[in-house]
Amino acid sequence: MSDRFVATDADGLQHHNGHRRRWPLPVLEAGGWRPGDVVEPDEHGTPVVLDADQLLDELGECVFLAEPAGEAGAARLVAATSWSEKQAAAFALDCVEHILEIVPGSAEAELPDGGSLGEIIASARQYLDNGTSTDTHRLGFVSRIAAARRLRRESTAIGDAAFTAAAQAEGQGVDIMSDPAWETLAAARDAVLAAVEAVRHVAFPFLAERETRRYEAHEERKVAEVDQVDTPWGRFAVGGAGPKYAPSWVAARDAAERSRQAAADLNGPPAGEAERSWQVGRLVERLRAE
């Protein structure tokens, strides 16, 4: 039987089909992992464990190995995988690099401020691997476009003036990337934007931690005034009302999904399924990374 997984937040809370379930976490001891306590079926049904293909659509902050235990339908977490913010961003880049090799002309497609999709992904990979890049300004520009486009796509009300101003400042780039000339490369473009968002989350964990908790809680209430934080990628707004940046695992899901769509757009549904199969294999490699 292949491995089974459970995706949770850092506290062991799983979100699945509108239900939340708390899993006791395994503990790493000197002799190896001590499994968490068994989770029994409840009023919401049996505990949900996933194979690697199912996990691709339900990536979370943490991913644990799980196994059946006790009565029928019960399960427990037995060990953590190697999944992390950095592995999520690396997986997003894996998906995008693979699809840029497949879709003709996608790697050479130019960004609003110059450069190409292929170049920005190479810069993002360099930053993720080495913590530095010669193209940090463009990485920041693209990550802000990514956030603004996602908020526009989700019809999310941006509830504070500071972030609204920041989104407007990137507005020209957002609009240019909506131009009909991008139509045939739309899915590849969106995959690139999602991957850069994932790397931004890793690059600046002090932003990521705050936004991650807000994203998980779906906070909408007014909180402390917005902070403008200067980083090597430029200025970012944090705080205010509502989450503004997707966590790295959400961006990784988006990058994978849009990469599959790019393959399907090019060569039909079987190509999208083939891309999914490749992604599942790569995801398992990331989960097992040392």
Regions found by a protein language model. Give the residues of each.
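Short, glycine-biased loop/turn motifs at secondary-structure junctions and
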Residues: 1-290
